[in-house]
Amino acid sequence: LMWEQLNRIIKPNGAIVLFGSEPFSSHLRMSNISMYKYDWIWHKNKSGNVFLYKISPMKRTENIMVFLNGVLTPQNEPNITFNHNAKKSDKLMKTVMKNEGVQNNGKRKDDSYKKYYGNTGYEDNVLRYDVDKNRIHPTQKPIELLKHLVKMYTNENETVLDFTMGSGTT
């Protein structure tokens, strides 16, 4: 029922971004594997799951699952909103891909691409945000993390629906 309603209202190439931990995250991904595209990992400054510390690891990370109403391919890139925080231009990545990164068959020519790796300014999949000190609820998400995600997946003046709003951080 959740996916039926979300599919009814999502715009073409729109994103649905949901938080979770295992095993719930796996169930959520598999409940709509056709729209699931990738995860972010939220690395927290404080561990959760403190009441189970004797029998399980304390959780310092949380999954942020991204579901897209569209195809995630380079050809569809102009249609998908993804406002990343790249510090360097796409020109560098194009140079790497053309000159040093890959051959026509998609295989790497050699290890020369490694000098650029991690130096592009593009984000990796780990987002580091501290838990807000003045939160209302123990699972409340940091305002700065939510701002980052909203800016990443929407353009100015677009509508955002938070159907899991909990304490209303968004």
Residue ranges of each PLM-predicted region?
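Core catalytic lobe of class I
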Residues: 1-170
